[in-house]
Amino acid sequence: VAGYTPATGDDREAMLGAIGVDSIDKLFEQVPEEVRLGRPLALEDGLSESEVFSRMAELASKNRDPEGEPGFLGAGMYDHYVPAIVDAITSRSEFLTPYTPYQPEVSQGGLQVMFEFQTAMSEITGLPVSNAGLYEGPSAAASAAYLAMAVTGRNGLVASRGMHPHSRETLATHAVGFGAELSEVGLEDGLTDAAALEAAIGEDTAAVFLQNPNFLGSVEDIARLGEFASARGALVVVAVDPMTLGVLRPPGECGADIAFGEGQPLGNRLDFGGPSFGFFCAREEYLRRMPGRIAGQTEDVDGRRGFVLALQTREQHIRREKATSNICTSQALNALAGVIHLSWLGKAGFVEIGEMLARRTDFARRRIAAIDGFELLHDAPVVREFAVRSTSVPVEALRSGADATGSRLQVYPLGRDYPEFEDGFLVALTEQRDVKDIEWLCAALERSAAAGSAAAGAAGAGGADSVA
């Protein structure tokens, strides 16, 4: 803002006097003249507050409005409704601070939030131990690998290609530093290839990584796949979408040793892909190998309930070689948003939203499968996301508006991560996409398919004429 300065001339003189220096030049006399700028910074003239808002509005107008057309993007980040209570609580000064709450003297309110978050995540995953959160889903995958290798003393990691590509990439990066061997198992009809998975697990396998629902939206048989790992002494690690756990069996009941995931669907907006938070839950025997921080409930000398940082095996607190992580901020504010959202939903609401997603996804899937030029990539069961193959129009043309109809569909192109599905895309549903929005998407796909068929017919006719 024009003319604003944090220190007046009198302030500067007082500060110089306090350190026994009589001028700014004297303060910087040890800096060689040749490296000093010697002139004011070449900054544009300042703007008033109203002018700044006008400038920001001008820049924002160049963007596409994501709310102008129904969006069906998913692939790990979902446009869920964030209730007003989330912003109302997270914006309170007791929580919205510039300092990360990992010091031992953190407030009782901050510690209770961590404890409530851990309790909620343990409940929905069916595992007894949760930490206070991690950066995001993929880094939680790396932490799971580290824990599994430490517990088993093995260095082999096996990951299904149904796992999110970002998590697999992160595992591959960390495997280099861990000295681990990472192998991937392919998919068959949208599900992890069970025979290939069983064959890939060896005596040196520390952990098997699965995802449910997987990246294509398919619901995996975690109990069956996990048996292959458990039979050979490997840990079963499952990535989960928290919003599906109201209708799916929790991973802890399916034999998982560790469950982790991306917490963005809970109380966090898309925000250009972040920030978000990750969650990490495990069986109790792995408590002391858990990454990050764990808050506990206790009693003081007067018998009053209190909260403490029970465990924080970070490299800032203990010897580096014994640390389980070096996490700092831990995205505590984002995790707070997540537990507020869960509390707002309640147990009945959590189940209700899962059932709603399943109904709407089933409706969308059946409608799209009936459109000429599009077919389902697989027939495995799904909850809130599914894969579609376009046989009429290139996927990028659908997304860019270059399909002769001008439609620019907000769907995720599978070819980015799966070359074998170059003609495929993901359709994701949230509670913000109702039947009207699904019909809008289907109408756009029908127009695109019709335009593609017409263009192909015209090209064929032109080719026939030239041959004739």
Model-inferred region functions:
Residues 1-38:
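Compact, charge-rich alpha-helical regulatory domains located at protein termini
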Residues 2, 11, 17, 119, ...:
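PLP-dependent enzyme catalytic core of the Aspartate aminotransferase-like
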Residues 2-5, 17, 42-46, 104-107, ...:
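Hydrophobic alpha-helical scaffolding
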Residues 15, 139-304, 373, 396-401, ...:
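Conserved PLP-enzyme active-site core in the AAT-like
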Residues 33-116:
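N-terminal entrance/gating region of PLP-dependent enzymes' catalytic architecture
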Residues 102-106, 122-142:
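Short loop-beta-helix segment that forms the pyridoxal 5′-phosphate
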Residues 266-372, 376-379:
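Active-site C-terminal subdomain of aminotransferase-like
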Residues 348-441:
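Conserved C-terminal alpha-helix-loop-beta "cap" of PLP-dependent enzymes
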